[in-house]
């Protein structure tokens, strides 16, 4: 008898600090896909820490296992110990977030050295916010990265960084990080094709007091790396170049007072506050462009889903998903050195060029079909299968 017929199906554990809303659908689909491949998924997670709790985006997954997260502050930095070793015992592959502050990663690496499990990393490769990065933390991250049994890289750019550590390319899976935007596209369809939907959008326009037909939109958290002072200065210049230009800000955060003061001074600037999920869709339908001169992350996928091109700059601290923006095809990427006036001139030129704007919207539609959570799940499941194959465990 083949000894493998006596084996139980292989088990893969994913250890996550906490589960944000945008990851729920991914984990649900991944569990289903791995079950189809005769692989058991164990998801282990905790509560958000002090730097995340204010986001209000944590969700509970009844089918997963929740463990306590213990936080320790050392030299002003928050470190985490996740009480998960007992739950992870016996897993053939443990996938963790690549973060030097997650202390359990070092314990799991020791268990891998002892032949007790295999450790895979999932992440960015480096801390893209270099001004916040710890030199020791980044050195530890590189050392651990080279010793992982497998790597799940967010994007092609992440994979290139990991290869730069000396990690073998054949053990890297590019997962093409994405979120589920189906609800956004369904809501867009409803709002644009039904009489009641169109009236809802018109009512929002009246409620905001939008009189112009050239509208910019900012959606997201408001903090330093979003460059709101830069954007507000640029908006004033756009208004000079495009007299009916209006700007809508959706979101909250420590820099929200900057936007509120600008809105008080300029009636064509509208400060809305936080709006989530499909409730954001009508704001996109009122907009011609998303203006985001600072950090861009998964929000680029909202622009693709809702067919509103983004204008941004090539700052060095973008999240990996900025790789999905193809300058001149599905959005616009300006120099990191551009001034607010130059940013404004580029945005105004696009508002005046309907043909070019239509091409960018078509590019958004194409990108929408490429960067999907379903594709991410398939790539991730392929990586899991390959990692288990290395151990001779995939069935």
Report each predicted region and the residues it spans.
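Nucleotide-activated donor-binding/catalytic signature segment of Leloir-type glycosyltransferases, i.e.
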Residues: 9, 69, 257-278
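A conserved mid-protein helix/loop that constitutes part of the nucleotide-sugar donor-binding site
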Residues: 24-28, 214-237, 247, 254-257, ...
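A short, well-ordered alpha-helix in the C-terminal region of glycosyltransferases
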Residues: 239, 342, 349, 356-370
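A short, histidine- and acid-enriched strand-loop-helix "catalytic/donor-clamping" loop
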Residues: 103, 117-135, 147-150
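Donor nucleotide-sugar binding/catalytic pocket of nucleotide-sugar-dependent glycosyltransferases
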Residues: 142-203, 210-211
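Acidic donor-binding loop of glycosyltransferase active sites
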Residues: 285-298, 308-309
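Conserved donor-binding/catalytic core segment of Leloir-type glycosyltransferases
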Residues: 13, 192, 198-199, 203-226, ...
């Amino acid at each position: 008898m083949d000894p493998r017929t006596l084996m139980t199906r292989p088990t893969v554990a994913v250890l996550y600090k906490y589960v944000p809303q945008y990851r729920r659908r991914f984990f649900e689909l991944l569990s289903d896909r791995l079950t189809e491949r005769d692989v058991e998924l164990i998801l282990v997670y905790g509560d958000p820490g002090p730097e995340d709790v204010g986001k209000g985006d944590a969700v509970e997954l009844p089918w997963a296992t929740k463990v306590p997260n213990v936080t320790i502050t050392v030299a002003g930095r928050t470190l985490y110990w996740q009480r998960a070793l007992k739950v992870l015992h016996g897993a053939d592959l443990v996938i963790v977030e690549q973060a030097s502050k997650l202390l359990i990663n070092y314990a799991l690496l020791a268990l891998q050295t002892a032949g007790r499990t295999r450790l895979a990393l999932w992440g960015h490769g480096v801390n893209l916010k270099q001004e916040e990065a710890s030199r020791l933390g980044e050195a530890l991250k590189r050392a651990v990265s080279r010793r992982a049994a497998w790597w799940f890289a967010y994007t092609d750019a992440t994979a290139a960084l990991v290869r730069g550590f000396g990690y073998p390319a054949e053990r890297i899976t590019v997962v093409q990080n994405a979120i589920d935007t189906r609800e956004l596209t369904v809501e867009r369809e409803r709002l644009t094709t039904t009489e009641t939907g169109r009236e809802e959008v018109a009512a929002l326009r009246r409620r905001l007091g939008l009189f112009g037909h050239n509208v910019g939109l900012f959606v997201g958290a408001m903090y330093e790396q979003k460059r709101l002072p830069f954007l507000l200065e640029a908006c004033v210049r756009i208004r000079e170049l495009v007299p009916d230009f209006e700007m809508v800000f959706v979101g909250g955060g420590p820099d929200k007072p900057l936007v509120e003061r600008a809105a008080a001074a300029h009636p064509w600037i509208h400060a809305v506050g936080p709006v989530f999920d499909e409730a954001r869709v009508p704001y996109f339908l009122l907009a011609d462009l998303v203006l985001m001169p600072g950090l861009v992350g998964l929000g680029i996928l909202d622009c693709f889903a809702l067919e509103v091109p983004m204008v941004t700059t090539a700052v060095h601290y973008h999240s990996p998903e900025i790789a999905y923006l193809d300058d001149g095809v599905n959005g616009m990427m300006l120099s990191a050195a551009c001034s607010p006036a130059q940013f404004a001139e580029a945005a105004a030129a696009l508002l005046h060029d309907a043909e070019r704007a239509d091409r960018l919207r078509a590019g958004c539609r194409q990108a929408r079909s490429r960067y999907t959570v379903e594709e991410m799940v398939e790539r991730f499941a392929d990586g899991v299968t390959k990692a288990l194959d290395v151990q001779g465990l995939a069935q």
